[in-house]
């Protein structure tokens, strides 16, 4: 199981031992995020050997990082959507089009599980939550736990 030691909007450098590069309070995402369940379970380790477009994945990561660094929601969401393009190229199912979503992608390893959607504002996000209760849609908020 995952143990969350860092809160806020974090950028991690991946590798054998990931490390934290940048941490923000995440206020630019307040009132704008939702999670919902696809209804499909998944087994992330079984996808490890799949072909990946590492160039596109790296570009999406750099763009999202720049968005966090600049506190720019549009840049961050462009990076998220580019990551979703990688997921589609890997064979994941196309996600439903949801009104007023800036960005969307599978969480974690994808191929089922949870979906993250970022909306323009709290009104659009909350409308989605109310309309998609059958998908167990929930709002999520960034928070920063200062220790």
Please give the residue ranges for each predicted region.
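C-terminal nucleotide
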Residues: 2-109, 116-147
